From Swiss-Prot:
The gene is thi4. It comes from the Archaea. This is Thiamine thiazole synthase. It is an enzyme of class 2 (transferase). Its cofactor is Fe(2+). Involved in the biosynthesis of the thiazole moiety of thiamine. Catalyzes the conversion of NAD and glycine to adenosine diphosphate 5-(2-hydroxyethyl)-4-methylthiazole-2-carboxylate (ADT), an adenylated thiazole intermediate, using free sulfide as a source of sulfur.
Amino acid sequence: MALDEVKITRAIVESYLESFLKCTDVDVALVGAGPANLVAAKRLAEADVRVVLFEKRLSVGGGLWGGGMMFPRIVVQKEACRILDEYDIWYREFEEGYYVADSIEVVAKLTAGAIDAGAELINLVSVEDVMIREGDRIVGLVINWTAADMAGIHVDPLAIRARVVIDGTGHDAAVCRVVQKKIPGAIVGESGVIGEKPMWAALGEKIVVDATREVYPGLIVAGMAATTVAAGPRMGPIFGGMLLSGEKAASIALEKLAQSVD
């Protein structure tokens, strides 16, 4: 068979647009494809929720790839090992309570898990604003190509509708900061987006899970973004809290969706 370059082009464009159009009206839109949101996306998709996950970079995985200081290993505490088991991720006990996993395997399998469950992942797309309705409730996202932002060119964005948004943008807490900046009087969380504190692994791992919650009508925060909003300390290359945070964020989102139906 002779290959036709134009057919290759059409196959890519038509199939992508078909998928993209399905993502313009979803139940849950997740921003930032780090470990917390990858776990959340899988949980939500398994519950037959329409899910799209936007990542501004070329690659997904957030800070997982580099492990600790470019050593591709991460540490997970015992209570989160069950999530690694769910994805068939290999790990070993280093010392009591400290389990080590290959960071690249973790990224690959978390990503595959979300996709296999039915979540749609879209990379190279940035979220620059939110969409609101009565009472300034968040009802969607305003998106644009990351390349347009990097090039500094003015291109009007597009919008997608979502019943719930999850900010998993890491240290930036980007969606939360947009809400705080652009909605008069908006208070994200208890005191607004304060920013993270210096490292304290034990406390940071607790706070990242405790701080995973709805912080503004229609907006849930997960992972390091939750820590940033709650002014918790960073925790470094231990990722159990991130995985548990994603699990909790999905559970909260499902509760919110059920309430909106009622």
